[in-house]
A protein has these predicted regions:
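Core nucleotide-handling region used for phosphoryl-transfer chemistry
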Residues: 1-282
Length: 282
């Protein structure tokens, strides 16, 4: 089965920063795959533990019906055509009901737009979904200020999902990002929403430069959430202020434990060896 076609709201693709050689092994002592990583080499990145699971999206979308905004909630996999296992789907829908999700976002199923006088309701003003004149809120509702979609991204993980049996004997959901329309929220905003929803958040490991992160993963570290002692999958790193590159893409990358294991198993050392770059793989 080939790779699934990415959907419009599929989570940001997270690449490694290394090129690969003709044996599909990382080339950790050569140039990085993108020039911005060299420029940012000595900057501190926020690092989260990489979880081995299946990507899950919780999409909250709006519709305008008569005099109200109506919100709907759906659960999706990595792509729109991806299937969620029966066990995980049951867990998600029973644990994170529509009301819980909307409450965590400060929304209600049906939000009245205008009062009996034709002015924006207090709820619309509180949300600042109204026109603003010289810094003052007006009584005029402004639909362009209402987000079209909130997306909560996370990982379904646990027994029966990838090799995640060492994490836990059942299945669960752990969050790692929240997006409002096309903007990913900062860590503090993300955490606030997941905490209100009662969702565990991927473990924050700390701040690292790129070289520090590479060395940290190469040495290996245990998963912070696994019930059984087990090496973590690696790190996912991003800039604290969610910077983007010149193509408008998020600066986010991963360093994987298994890549270093494969390097050692192939070459018998963690030191630099002669490698020939694979022109087709990263």
């Amino acid at each position: 089965m080939g790779k699934q076609k990415r959907s419009e709201n599929t989570y940001t693709k997270i690449n490694t920063i290394f090129f690969r050689d003709e044996n599909n092994i990382i080339m950790p002592y050569d140039e990085f795959v993108a020039p911005e990583f060299e420029w940012l080499r000595n900057c501190k990145f926020d690092a989260d533990e990489k979880i081995d699971g299946t990507n899950i999206r919780i999409e909250v979308t709006r519709q305008v019906e008569d005099n109200a905004i109506v919100w709907s909630v759906v659960f999706k996999g990595k792509t729109d055509k991806a299937t969620i296992t029966t066990k995980l789907d049951k867990y998600l829908k029973e644990t994170f009901t529509e009301d819980k999700i909307l409450n965590a976002l400060g929304l209600s199923k049906k939000m009245i737009i205008l009062d009996e006088n034709g002015n924006a309701t207090q709820e619309m003003k509180d949300k600042k979904w109204v026109n603003i004149d010289n810094g003052e809120l007006t009584n005029e509702f402004d639909i362009s200020r209402v987000p079209e979609m909130y997306t909560l991204y996370g990982e379904g993980y646990g027994a029966g999902i990838q090799s995640g049996g060492y994490y836990r004997e059942d299945v669960a959901f752990i969050g790692f990002d929240v997006k409002v329309d096309d903007m990913y929220l900062l860590r503090v905003q993300r955490d606030d929403i997941f905490n209100k929803l009662g969702v565990d958040i991927v473990p924050y490991i700390g701040q690292f430069t790129i070289d520090e992160a590479i060395e940290f993963v190469k040495k290996g570290f245990n998963s912070k959430i696994a019930k059984k002692e087990h090496l973590a999958e690696g790190l996912v790193l991003r800039t604290p202020m969610e910077l983007k590159n010149r193509r408008g893409e998020r600066i986010i990358f991963k360093v994987k434990t298994c890549d270093w294991n494969k390097y050692f198993n192939k070459y018998g050392t963690y030191d630099k060896v002669e490698q020939i770059k694979n022109k087709f793989l990263k």
